[in-house]
Amino acid sequence: MKSLYSNVLVLDSGARGSLTTFVQRGIGDVLISWENEAHLALQETAKNQNVEIVFPSVSILAEPSVAVVTKNAEKHNTLKVAENYLKFLYSPEGQETIAKNYYRPTDKKVASKYKNTFKNLKLFTIRDVAGSWKNAQEKHFSDGAIFDQITSKQ
C-alpha cells in the first residue's frame, strides 16, 4: 500500500474533490472512488475523454446513514416532514430517485430495473471485516494506525 500511495499526485479531502481533480483538472491515471462518483465521472467525461469504470468483484457495502433526530425536529416543528422524508427514501418512488442518482437501491424491483448500472458484486460490510465502525476507525485512522503508516514520508 505504501508503494501504491507513493504514486498519488493529489490527495483531496473528499470524493467530490477527487472527482474534480481527476476529471476537470486531468490529474491522475486512476480514480478510486465511490460507485456513484464513478458514474458521475463517466457522465461528465462522456463527450471529451476516454473514461471507463472498472468494477471489482468484491467491494464494501457503504450505506449512508439516515435518521430523524426527534428532539431537533420537534424543536423546529419539522418532525412529520422528517419522518415522511425517511419513509419516502424507502418507497419505490424514493428508491427510483436514489437509483437515478447512482446510489444502489435496496428495493429489489427497482434494483432489477437498474441491473446494467449496478453490477452484481460480492459486497461485505465493515462489521464483516472489522467487527464495528469503532474498530475500523481505530485500526485504520487513529494516530499511528495504518493510514498514518502508509502516508508517512519515512
What kind of feature is each model-predicted range?
Residues 11-12, 31, 56-59, 75-82, ...:
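Solvent-exposed, acidic/flexible segments
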Residues 45-46, 58-60, 115-118:
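A generic structural signal for short, solvent-exposed coil/turn residues
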Residues 1-56:
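Ligand-binding pocket segment of bilobal, Venus flytrap-like solute-binding proteins
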